[in-house]
Structure formats: structure tokens, C-alpha cells
């Protein structure tokens, strides 16, 4: 039985970038398995499964959404009684040893439901991905209000920048780009909300886990995220972001 399963949701991604994420996860002495869950309109990425025998490729033949696609793999992990499931973005990469350190910390702290390492840009700068619980007003104002000083002050508070990001913290909201999840916690609080097609599904899940377990930022380990704010570039994606914020606030 694997010690850790992981899932990467695909949607017409670049194979070169995906290969870095895949190789990062599989470069471990732990017993692992990786699900590639493909939401693309064709299966041109299926040959990625030939990289390693520990990969299982799932083609949905439709864009089911981020959370729904990850849930397909998470349910398999739960059915297989795997202790941990890693939700992994396709633009993440990291050195050997990262999984071992996170696995060990989770094994020694059974009250943790989700753990996130320190996440860096490719140039080495910190990505401030520890968050307070947002409201729809926060999300909309941070996107549209032109007052730079006001936005910066609000962002500093919202992203917990005063903490220095140099100590272990129990944080209400952790990023969905790398969610190292305890499957027993997921059985307790539920999986991704499939009513949220895109954006804030990670916020919602992190919030629910945080009500019963610790959700830990662990800066002793670091990974790299080739991050891009896609919702800022696309009106359609921004619409999904706002709809998700409104839906979450109505729960």
C-alpha cells in the first residue's frame, strides 16, 4: 500500500512543465502513487503515464472542474486506505527529501489535517500563501480598488506578512497548489465542494479542515511554484473567481 498518493489535474498543459512536477513527486524513497486526472478535451497527455509505473492516468473527456477532478483521485486514496493524499499543481517542483520531511512531521503530529511548506517563486522570493479567511468584499476590493497603499496594508494583514514566514504556524487558509492532506481528516470534513467549479475550492476545504484539525505552515521545507494569477488575466476566469466567493459566503 502506498504511503502517499498524489493527484495533478491536467488541462492542455505543457508536457515539459508537467514532467518537472511528476519527477519531483516520484523522486522519493517513500511508497507513492500519482494520479494524473485529465480534464482536457483530448487525451494527448496520456503518454505521460509511461514516465513511471507508479502513475495512473484518468481521462475525463470533459472539464469537470478542479475540485471534482481531484476528488476522483482522493476517493481512490480513501478506498485504498492510504494515509495521505497530496493535491499538487502542475507548476510545482521540489528537491528530493521534501516528501519525507512532511510525511515524518505528519506522522508525529496526528492533530494536523493539512500541511503546506514554504513556497517560493523561481527567483527565490517568498510567495505569501498563508491567508486569513476572506470575504467576497475582500476578494473584490483587493482586485479592483486602485488605492495602492490601502491595498498593500490590507494584503499584508490578509497574507500574514507580519509573521515573517519563518516559523511554524496554524493558519486558517493554506494554498491549494500543494495540499498535503490526511485522508482520515477528509473522511471527517468532506472532500472538495463540487459546486465550486474553479477558485476558492481550496479555501473552502482548508477552512473546513481548520475547524477540526490544525492546518500547518511548515517553513522548514521549501518548494518552488511557477505561479501566475490566471484570474487576473481572463475575464471568464475572474467571473469564476467572484462566483466562487459569493457561493462560499452563502454557506
Predicted regions and their residues:
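Short, well-formed alpha-helical segments that are part of the catalytic scaffolds
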Residues: 13-27
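A conserved acidic beta->alpha catalytic loop
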Residues: 36-47, 62
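Glycine-rich, basic loop-to-helix element that forms the pyrophosphate-binding segment
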Residues: 61-80
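Conserved donor NDP-sugar-binding/catalytic core segment of glycosyltransferases
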Residues: 93-129
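A short, conserved alpha-helix in the catalytic core of glycosyltransferases
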Residues: 164-166, 172-222
